[in-house]
């Protein structure tokens, strides 16, 4: 009983400090699960909305906020298979509000910015320059937004688009204020801050040992350190890849299968940098199934992991993305250590020549 009261007091202290230091940016994780079902948007988007509408201890306010978030998603979220239906409604009504991932590019020939809608399938939509100036993440991979669209077809402007962006509002953190984060961190002890970090990724620290807490925090290192390479092997369905797919908008999870040097590092035809130049962290799920179509793919990956750079053609390129390899093991660690090797399934990646001889 005493331990329970101590735990509750500790939670109350942390919650109060969070409200004082990060008001409007904290959210109950159990609410995310209620809304996630049926909404195909990343967890960090749901949490941003919940932080806006449910930042209260009053059950009635929280319930109203959850209903508001559900209504917003139901009314405005664009599913790719309903894109034409949404465009038809936009044409009929003259205006419509959508939730979609927006990427902005600068059209150098015409000297203005253009927006691209991921699910709606729209490209080359003019957008006011105030938005990329204010939310620079629009230019670097895109962000999820609520967008108010107008539709006005003009006969004399047949070459233009009838669709215009009236207002754009990000529904994920468009940027991180490091100074604010550092200032707020000063109010917490090390143990309290560890608990905050773990709860931020959906883990309950009160059920974990001190060692388990540190192991889970190690998972986060590739998200904040440049060129930090990590391999995690464990039983199936234990949440190893969840962190890299759902928690951060700056990481990408590549499902196991074939990949190419052009996709991962550099496309010599288009002169564009691949995933390592676009994301803070590139994670590979089911790493045992990864295969490169290019013969030199594994060697280029090794060079990049060792030095943070790679050579393609006549140029050497540098990037800062960390790499994470997530894989499954089908036996207990104790049994594997006695009878085999934890990394046996990765031989074809690390030593392709030797693997061919073994086969």
Predicted features along the sequence, with ranges:
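Short acidic (Asp/Glu) and glycine-rich catalytic loops that position anionic groups and cofactors
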Residues: 173-176, 279-284, 350
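Residue-level detector of conserved catalytic or cofactor/ligand-binding positions
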Residues: 345-358
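Extended, charged/polar low-complexity intrinsically disordered regions
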Residues: 2-200
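A generic structural micro-environment signature
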Residues: 123, 155, 203, 207, ...
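Conserved ASCE/P-loop NTPase catalytic core
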Residues: 204-336, 342
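Short amphipathic alpha-helical surface micro-motifs
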Residues: 125-132, 149-153, 176-181, 235-236, ...
